[in-house]
């Protein structure tokens, strides 16, 4: 749970969480500050965490950075990236040729993973080449990236960051 991440993770792991899942440049300083603060007493609430990290939160971007910190902790606690990877890998096994995979992502980490997987059938690196030197990829992208229009965002503000990608499984 979040309490465990904040109060029991060592500095390198906290740094990894904030860097990998929050994409925070200040991850080393944030991790160090948390480690120092919890030596006195555990950090029990989001308000306490906010207070501990206050010196790293410039007023003009305070809410943005806090959102990234909370996002990073949530992703770690729920193992969201691992679950997404597992789902995408299973889609390869489950989908029949010409079957379609549609995925809505809500932040750049998810979208990067989905985009790379749909393009290469992998999460990192280049796809393998076949005997003739052609890339062997399991999907072809269908249409363009779909994002909500202004009207949709007015109806549902949380949709503002949503991105829908669609790919079709190729017969190999």
Name each region found by the language model.
Residues 1-172:
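S-adenosyl-L-methionine-dependent methyltransferase catalytic core, i.e., the SAM/SAH-binding region
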């Amino acid at each position: 749970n979040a309490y465990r991440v904040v109060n029991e993770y060592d500095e390198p792991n906290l740094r990894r969480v904030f860097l990998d899942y929050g994409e925070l440049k200040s991850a080393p300083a944030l991790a160090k500050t948390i480690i120092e603060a919890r030596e006195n007493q555990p950090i029990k609430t989001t308000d306490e965490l906010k207070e501990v990290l206050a010196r790293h939160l410039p007023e003009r971007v305070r809410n943005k950075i806090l959102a990234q910190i909370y996002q990073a902790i949530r992703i770690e606690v729920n193992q969201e990236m691992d679950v997404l990877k597992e789902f995408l890998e299973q889609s390869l096994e489950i989908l029949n040729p010409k079957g379609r995979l549609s995925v809505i992502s809500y932040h750049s980490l998810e979208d990067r993973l989905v985009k790379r997987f749909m393009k290469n059938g992998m999460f990192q690196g280049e796809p393998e080449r076949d005997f003739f030197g052609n890339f062997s990829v399991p999907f072809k992208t269908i249409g363009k990236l779909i994002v909500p229009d202004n009207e949709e965002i007015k109806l549902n503000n949380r949709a503002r960051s949503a991105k829908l990608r669609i790919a079709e499984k190729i017969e190999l």
